[in-house]
Amino acid sequence: MCAFPWLLLLLLLQEGSQRRLWRWCGSEEVVAVLQESISLPLEIPPDEEVENIIWSSHKSLATVVPGKEGHPATIMVTNPHYQGQVSFLDPSYSLHISNLSWEDSGLYQAQVNLRTSQISTMQQYNICVYRWLSEPQITVNFESSGEGACSMSLVCSVEKAGMDMTYSWLSRGDSTYTFHEGPVLSTSWRPGDSALSYTCRANNPISNVSSCPIPDGPFYADPNYASEKPSTAFCLLAKGLLIFLLLVILAMGLWVIRVQKRHKMPRMKKLMRNRMKLRKEAKPGSSPA
């Protein structure tokens, strides 16, 4: 029974919209971050009185009927997926979506029905949800051929990368830099060639991450080195050494503080005994009867 008044309201809104003039306000690309919030701004002419606002995405999302003379607006969220996830910001009732998921990507539109001019405006948004990228992972495929020549391919990837990813490689020599587009880098080496290092860079519209530099010398010297995932090993080794150094500094600091306390305690006790002795000597002795 509670749903019947809302159903009647929607039917009346649809019937009234058939006699209106329509005005298209364009489409807007909106970049959003996974598990964060986004607001879809809605522009309403200041001299117009709004009859209602209908938000939709794939299907009806919510209907907003502004209140009159200080009364609150009537808001009905019609899509269960957005219950507790959306709110509407005064004074234009822009749509605010919190805790974004991949499913929230896609087209959204706002239909604003104006009471005074009998005109309906339509504004569209395309939400693209992305996530912050983690450190790139490198896969190495190593092959050796005759006459001491070697070839190697490096494949760069990011876990749960999502859409619109781009990859590039930076090859660095003694005094040269070379850029390569794409996630796969193929290279070769012959005796006498100078050693290079390779860095993968991964990008999406909201973040930019790079791998640790990978030297090619260990690969050509030892083909089994390719199975050790050097970029991850180097990064873990550097982080481990840094943590170990911090722990050593912390332990030395605690030891110094403890030694200082040990030296201070006998002095404090001796000082307290001297004070007590002086106080006793300062008191007048009892005279004999």
From Swiss-Prot:
Glycans are attached at N99, N208. GO terms for cellular component: cell surface; external side of plasma membrane. The keyword Manganese does not apply. It comes from Homo sapiens (Human). Expression is predominantly restricted in hematopoietic tissues. Expressed in heart, spleen, liver, intestine, muscle and testis. Expressed in immune cells, including monocytes, dendritic, B- and T-cells. No expression was seen in peripheral blood leukocytes. Expressed in the leukocyte cell line THP-1. Keywords: Disulfide bond, Glycoprotein, Immunoglobulin domain, Membrane, Signal, Transmembrane, Transmembrane helix. This is SLAM family member 9. InterPro entries: CD2/SLAM_rcpt, Ig-like_dom, Ig-like_dom_sf, Ig-like_fold.
